[in-house]
Amino acid sequence: MKKMFLFAACLAVLACSCSEKEEGTVKDVRASLKINANIGAPAVSRAEKTAWEAGDKLGLYVCNGTLGTPYNQNAVYTNTPFTYSAAGWTSEEILLDENEATVFAYYPYDATLTTPSALPVDITTQTDHLYGQGDTKASILNRNVNITMKHALSQVVFRMKKTEGYRQEGVLTGITLKNVGSATPLYTRATMDISTGSLTKTTAGNVEFSAGATLTDKAVSFSSIVVPVDATAGKDMQAVFTIDGKQLQFTFPAGTKWERSYRNIYDIVLGNNGLVIGGADGSGVTIEPWTDDVKGEIQLVPVI
């Protein structure tokens, strides 16, 4: 990579005017790209990315307009890592000339990525995949680019507590989202186009939450990042909760959808008659941009 930059620098030297040579000064007619990346739609959860930490890495593709055309037709501008520190974002120099470049970014950086239109996504790792594009074209005249990173996935959150009169311990040992019947709205693997955040679903499967706690009268949250779900045609998904050795389930209604960049929050109260999601006033099921929305009351029933 350094040899390629050196070769390019030599070409720039040859392009300088004779007057510059006579003065003993040679100017490089290019500048190095600088970025400022921020995360859009902040939220709070263990799985989602809300702020940068030292050592975080973005992958950048500097292109001639579209993702498949590297800047100046040079592969050196593909999948360049930018690393975050207290000083901001740094990388090896990405030199720009007068030609305008479109900058695409993704998180987290994958050194093995060769097809940026098909970045592998695996829900079992609970990685919050982000994508973004520079707000302006980059060139020697504009080398500072701002990038707002967006969430490509969705999130499901269950906020759970028990009533004071609940007669058992309230030991939660598992939460599973399941496909029902032949329909497969739930997927565990997909690929992402880093320029648009669009996902191609590849492997259907159930989603297991990391859940283990003894419920009290104070709500505690359990969350999972999920591949977005299009509006279901029927009752194609269930949530199964294992509490005090028993299974309680909820079948999501037709039309349920979980959109990318949103988190879907379900408030659950455990009582002697089972679990209740939501309330009689229509509260308790909230959708937030990770734009609040509220749905009606939902009941969970024991698995027979």
Task: Give the residues covered by each predicted segment.
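Sec-type signal peptide cleavage vicinity
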Residues: 2-11, 15-304
